[in-house]
Each structure stands twice: as structure tokens, then as C-alpha cells.
Amino acid sequence: MINHYIKISPEVSEALANNRPVVALESTIIAHGMPYPQNVETALQVEDIIRKNGATPATIAIIDGQLRAGLSKDEIDYIGKLGQKVVKVSRRDLPFIVAKKMTGATTVASTMIIAEMAGIKIFATGGIGGVHRGAESSMDISADLQELANTNVVVVSAGAKAILDLKLTLEYLETHGIPVAGFGTDEFPAFYTRKSGLPVLYRVDTIIELAEMIYTKWQLGLNGGVLVANPIPDQAQVEFEYINEMIEKAVLIAEEKGINGKAITPFLLAKIEELTKGESLKANIQLVFNLSLIHI
């Protein structure tokens, strides 16, 4: 029923047909998460890291209304050059963007949806969306969390984006029965930094241990994904108190400007990059490289 809407690249199709590991990658980080040309350079380097480690990358996006699992270098450059002119697409946006034959960059939620359609089980991303600060009044909660509760894809990330309320994000994940596994860590990472002060309930230290847990979950008939929290490398992290101070400044500026909805995350990431004089962007790039090394 959905084959008509999705195009899987030859490289990804061959890997899936031969039961070789495939790692899905989102495209919002290309269009909205980093400036050009660092966005394209980072995306291509991530793909190279995945290939060198024995897996096949599948960068996911929507081009002219077609769901795409696996992009060419030219297509990645196209998305990167357009940048924030490309629509940021979550679950709610998919029918409109596809029907109107528009081009869109996929969030964690829509990347999970398209990955599952394509038969891809592993997805690496910098940080998931979550419960925003002040959500008790704004009700601003990312659709990424609901997707994790319903879609059978493993998401490997450096925790949730540090601009969020991480404590409430973990509470939401618990409420919806989403397993959170700390990969080599007892503490939930906070994107730019390895620490958040928030413990993870389950720690895994090897790929085999992690794979067995994921396999068991789905064999038990428990639908939904798994969040694997793989912290940023120690040498690449930003100092905890400093980055939190910069985040609070950026959040205050966003509130003063009345920025909200899907515009809030790209605005905050760009403002934090400005306030940290590029330090946050360097950390973001390094954590994405690190995440690309895990294949289950």
C-alpha cells in the first residue's frame, strides 16, 4: 500500500535484501540543525563513518513529495543548501507535504516512521525532542516521544536536546513504557554534556547485551522503540554549568521574541551556537560522529 510513496536507494535496498546492518539518519539536522556548509560536510562524514564500520547509511528525507530512504551526495547538498527554507516535517505534516509534492526535512518522529516503512530498525540522531521547559503551561511536548512509544525502531542518541526539561522528558518516556538504556553510562546524557544529574534505570555495556534486550522486547510483543542514550565523548563535551547558563539565556531571548512551536528548537540551537562562539556546534558535530559508531 505504501510502496507507491517511498523510494529506497539501491545501496540501502541491497543491504536490506542481504540482511546487512542499515542505520537511518534524519535530515532536520542538515536543514535546521547546522549552518551550510558544515551541515553537508557533517552529514557526509557521518555516512562515511557508518560505511567504514560495516553498515549502510540511510539518510531520510522527503523530496518532491516522495519519501526517501537513502540520499545521494547531491541530494544531501540540495537539502543542506536550502537549509531552513526546507519544511521541518513531523508525523502531523507528512500527509500534507507528500500530497503537495513538497520537499521536507524529517524530524526524529517522521524519520522513525519512514525507517519502519523501509524495514530499517536502527536510527542514529544527535538528540531526541522531548518535553520543553514550561510545558506545564504551554503543553509543548515533541511528537518524537509519542513515536518512540508506537514505532518499532531503536533510536541511538546523546540523550534529549539540552534545551528541554530533561526530568519531565524522562517522566514522559516512563509513562509511555519506552525503555531507556544507558550505553556505558548510569546517567542520562544531556546532549552537549555527559551529565544531567538524572540516572538511567538500565545500563548496558556491550552491543550484544543491548541487542539481546531489544530482541527480547519485540519477541515479547511489546511494540514501540527503545531509546539508547550514548553520551558525547568526554573530550568533546561542553562544561555543564557553562552550557546550562547559555541555554537559559537563549530560552529567555526566545520568550522575549515570542518564538514557539516548530521554530523554537532551530532558534535555540542557533542562539546557543552564537552565545558559545561556536563551541556548541563543535560538540554537536562530535557527538553525531560518536553515535554513528553503534550498529546493532
Give short role names for the model-derived ranges.
Residues M1-K52, M117:
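N-terminal glycine-/serine-/threonine-rich phosphate-binding loop
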Residues R194-Q219:
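Anionic-ligand binding region
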Residues S27, H32-M34, N39-F96, Q219-Q235, ...:
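Glycine-rich nucleotide/cofactor/substrate-binding loop typically near the N-terminus or early
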Residues E14-A17, V22-V23, K52, I113-M117, ...:
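Solvent-exposed alpha-helices and their adjacent loops that cap or buttress functional pockets
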Residues A105-V108, E136-A149, V153-E174, I207-E212:
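Active-site glycine-rich loop that binds ribose-phosphate moieties when present
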Residues V23-L25, P57-I62, G104, I122-G127, ...:
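General beta-strand structural signal in soluble alpha/beta enzymes
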Residues G225-F289:
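A C-terminal functional module that forms or caps the active site or interfaces directly
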Residues I294-I296:
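Conserved small/polar residues in nucleotide/adenosyl-binding loops
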